[in-house]
Amino acid sequence: MPKEMGGPGDEGATNPEQLFAAGYSACFENALRRVAGRQKKNVREASVTANVGIGRDGNGFGLKVELVGHLPGLQREEAEALMHDAHEVCPYSKATRGNIEVTLSVAE
């Protein structure tokens, strides 16, 4: 159980946030590639990192997610637009919309 929830933290063990991050980033990257393909944009070198945190909210505990797109070869504006478009179609994004805070960013 995570330390934030009163547990020992289990150093070296995979925690629920890491598992959620792995699933969300993989799903979002696939959505990003699909959207980019429709728009004829080359994202062969693209990757997505999900940073997931857990903390107290008004009713107990909640998640917070930052999705970071690594989109070499695209202008920042293009990359931001693709991230937004992928967020609209990604199944994880749809499932969490309105339930948790999700921020999108593009890596430098």
Q: What are the functions of these language-model segments?
A:
Residues 1-25, 29-108:
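Extended beta-strand/beta-hairpin segments
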